[in-house]
Amino acid sequence: MIQFKNISKHYQLKGQTIHALDQINLDIPAGSIFGIIGYSGAGKSTLIRLINLLERPTHGQIIINQKDFTALNAQSLRQERANIGMIFQHFNLLQTKTVAANIEMPLKLLGYSKIEREKRLMELLDFIDLTHKKDAFPDELSGGQKQRVGIARALANHPKILLCDEATSALDPQTTKSVLALLKKINKEQGITIVMVTHEMDVIESICDHVAVMESGHVIETGPTVEIFSNPQHPTTKTFIQTVLQQHLPVNILSKLEHQHHHSIYRLQFLGKSAQEPVIQSMIKQFDISLNILFANMTEIDGTVIGQMFVQLLGDDTLIQQAIEFLERHGVSVNQSGEQV
């Protein structure tokens, strides 16, 4: 487990104190894919760089597997850093070195023999599916291939933790998808804890099982990704989720409804089992009401299906209330439009 305990990071800039991080307390479970999301300047990149002490906190402790990294001497810290790999937005490959030389570099620095380096190199090239690019130079690679080389280099010494700082933000959507699939494979097959900094909520949706939302140097919300998506509390979190999971009726639909007879609009949210059962069909059969579907969407997060639907319920008020209670008994969250959701 990675633990941030009362972490603060302050900078001096033109005579002023900048509070990059302020009183951060956060636990990252071992073996998880943990996303850290926030807008530019939120402090997320500073936070991830504290894990391997590329940045040192002004106050607080970084505890990894029950070791306080902030209390380690230089030699002990070097040894512990060997268990932490890192990949970057712009790949950070040596342009004058081949793919093989880039991947082997950390192994050379750590004193691996030539035979050991060659063996590990071929394992990694096979794993990232770039054996045919062994002797190529970075300029001959696509963005996705460069990032795969960066990932292989980060994995060279069998790390227990992999830090990803905006690792997909320079890639096109299809390449992003393939890189995320590779990271998920690494986590599943090797049990490596992955910490991902991103400003893209679809990255969190695609791969992360836990997430922390940051704003102005604070963690404003954190928890399992499914819980955060299904029940966001902070306005900033809701804004992020809105980019991948519609939380409000689209404006064009609302404008059409303005000219229709008023009917209450409800937001129905289905989670897990309720998203896969014919709950709506059962409700319509049981109650003498009509249902007008205005908008619906569905996604899968960490193996759990989340669906939501904006509907008008038409009919007798008593029957509508009974229908709502029926839905809630069957695991559907019901909120009338305009209520806090």
Curated annotation (Swiss-Prot):
ATP binds at residues 38-45. Its EC number is 7.4.2.11. One of its GO terms (cellular component) is plasma membrane. It is found in: Cell inner membrane. Signal peptide: none annotated. SMART domains: AAA, NIL. Residues 2-241 form the ABC transporter domain. Keywords: Amino-acid transport, ATP-binding, Cell inner membrane, Cell membrane, Membrane, Nucleotide-binding, Translocase, Transport. InterPro entries: AAA+_ATPase (IPR003593), ABC_transporter-like_ATP-bd (IPR003439), ABC_transporter-like_CS (IPR017871), ACT-like_dom_sf (IPR045865), MetN_ABC (IPR041701), MetN_ABC_transporter-like (IPR050086), NIL_domain (IPR018449), P-loop_NTPase (IPR027417). It catalyses: L-methionine(out) + ATP + H2O = L-methionine(in) + ADP + phosphate + H(+); D-methionine(out) + ATP + H2O = D-methionine(in) + ADP + phosphate + H(+). It is an enzyme of class 7 (translocase). It is a peripheral membrane protein. One of its GO terms (molecular function) is ATP hydrolysis activity. Part of the ABC transporter complex MetNIQ involved in methionine import. Responsible for energy coupling to the transport system. Belongs to the ABC transporter superfamily. Methionine importer (TC 3.A.1.24) family. The complex is composed of two ATP-binding proteins (MetN), two transmembrane proteins (MetI) and a solute-binding protein (MetQ). This is Methionine import ATP-binding protein MetN 2. It comes from Acinetobacter baylyi (strain ATCC 33305 / BD413 / ADP1). The gene is metN2.
